[in-house]
Amino acid sequence: MGFRAFLVEKTGVGFERSIVERSESDLPEGELLISVKFSSMNYKDGLSATGNPGVTRNYPHTPGIDASGIVLESSHPDFDNGDEVIVIGFDLGMGTPGGFAERIRIPANWAVKCPPGLTLSLIHI
């Protein structure tokens, strides 16, 4: 299935940024496929989006070091399809395509279920 992602690409003279159509086959291996509902912009994402080599070394790249969303596919016993989850840190948005996309695929140990009383949008405030 296709989805949109913010992509930073290295060119001969700098970096280009655009919204592109991606395929789930473009995503890395992982136990959870997540439909991203929210992600926040922070300092590290800004550095990554401008091509800072101290933050991102592999291109093309999708920034976004955090994301919250709904599990679409799970091969891990602790998560079910439909679970609301939060992902912050690890390699997300650094070496692994990040939250500035409509889909991410990650190892299950990067995710936590959204606690009762907290919404996916409030996590990023």
Which positions does each model-derived feature cover?
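Glycine-rich beta-strand-centered segment in the early N-terminal region that forms part
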Residues: 25-41, 52-92, 98
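Conserved hydrophobic/aromatic beta-strand scaffold that supports enzyme active sites
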Residues: 17-19, 68-70, 84, 103-105, ...
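Cytochrome P450 core scaffold surrounding the K-helix E-X-X-R motif
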Residues: 44-46
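A structural motif shared across PLP-dependent enzymes of the aminotransferase-like
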Residues: 93-108
